[in-house]
Amino acid sequence: MLPSMSLPSLXWMLLSCLMLLSQVQGEDSPADTPSARISCPKGSMAYASYCYALFITPKTWMGADMACQKRPSGHLVSVLSGAEASFVSSLIKNNLNALSDVWIGLHDPTEGLEPNAGGWEW
């Protein structure tokens, strides 16, 4: 676990934002496999009927979330299956260096400043 003093600075080290261009479906979705038929905007990649884009822009979690929501049906990614985790992981590994951090939908709204404030949120 990171000391609470390092957590606020982590937000400024952020180099990436992941965006999901459609509503997220759960593990029981029949579309858990990659689909070659979906058409995504330029700079996005299709997986399981959804479009994913990786943005290399320094932002806080809130800033990244707002930037994603400005796009059609965009949200920070919520990883709901092992297959989706593998896809997202490979997207990050193929586009960023090993020292980069990314934001996803799960976050600590207190940025570690209040350890007993209720925990993580989507």
Curated annotation (Swiss-Prot):
Expression across tissues = In pancreatic acinar cells.
User: To which species is this protein native?
Assistant: Sus scrofa (Pig)
What's the protein here called? Answer: Lithostathine
In the record, what lineage is assigned to the organism producing the protein?
Eukaryota, Metazoa, Chordata, Craniata, Vertebrata
Q: Which UniProt keywords apply?
A: Disulfide bond, Lectin, Secreted, Signal
- Summary of subunit composition and partner proteins: Cleaved to give an A chain and a B chain joined by a disulfide bond.
What do the Gene Ontology cellular component annotations say? Answer: extracellular region
Q: What does this protein do?
A: Might act as an inhibitor of spontaneous calcium carbonate precipitation.
PROSITE patterns hit by this protein:
C_TYPE_LECTIN_2 (PS50041)
